[in-house]
Amino acid sequence: MATDITPSSAPQCPDHIVFEHVTKEFRTRSGTVRALDDVSLAIKRGSISAVIGHSGAGKSTLVRLINGLETPTRGRVLVDGTDVSQLSDKAMRPLRADIGMIFQQFNLFGSRTIYDNVAYPLKLAHWKKADEKKRVTELLSFVGLTSKAWDHPDQLSGGQKQRVGIARALATKPSILLADESTSALDPETTADVLSCLLYTSDAADDS
């Protein structure tokens, strides 16, 4: 049976994510650091986009602007036509629920089972227990970790941990999936495996 990874919300805008002349600066003890300088871009729904740059080039900052963890110093970041920086904390919650995030260092809960790690965002979204169980079961099958459901993260390889991260990021059927250097800690073979999983995810769902 195919796993449903289709976004739960319908498209609202052809350009899913838009940066309009975005500059982001940070103040440090040694002065102001400009992480992004007048960045403009548009990402269409259902597309795959990659940001390439050396360490410290502002890649992670760009990602954090999309999900509202950072706000622009100047310019606007729009998601489906909405200026993210103008949203209140309450209005930001449904937006963040529609954005999945895969981290470089996995960010799994070591004291929880693989099942519970994947179920975590569903609990935050107040899914019914039966729906939660069905969804987690589907996702663990999708990433090939059904037999690891009751293991803990320290029992998994790096590639398996990142597969858990992918499953967790897809749990609430987000329309946006952000991956912040999600393969940089993996060996080449495992990297190819994880990227194949992500490409299949994009092909199977109308997400960005």
Model-identified regions with their sequence ranges:
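A short, hydrophobic C-terminal helix/tail in secreted or cell-surface proteins
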Residues: 203-207
